[in-house]
């Protein structure tokens, strides 16, 4: 009877470990600027958890950095709605590149507002 439960528990442990390794690897690639490598991982994660604001940010930012501006916008909008601070910055960049200047300005202002609220440096965003 005990053997019946051991295999599924072991399988569950290995699956969870593989998931965290995949996420941490994708985050590492993102930090290193390897957006094309990280993008498929974040795409899979955002499909699995579409309401996760961070997954939406990472995937949207990867889309932006790989030149898919229009594809990036809905994911970045979702992350900004959930107050992911850098979501506002990337959304501002995407709107600017799509000639949606009023929206770009508003999102940049929102980015600065949330940086100030979290007591972070705003000098880079204000230049």
Each predicted region: which residue ranges?
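Alpha-helical segment of the N-proximal tetratricopeptide repeat
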Residues: 21-44, 48
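Register position in tetratricopeptide repeats
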Residues: 31-32, 65-66, 97
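Short coil turns that delineate tetratricopeptide repeat
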Residues: 50, 82-84, 116
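Canonical tetratricopeptide repeat
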Residues: 58, 90, 124-127
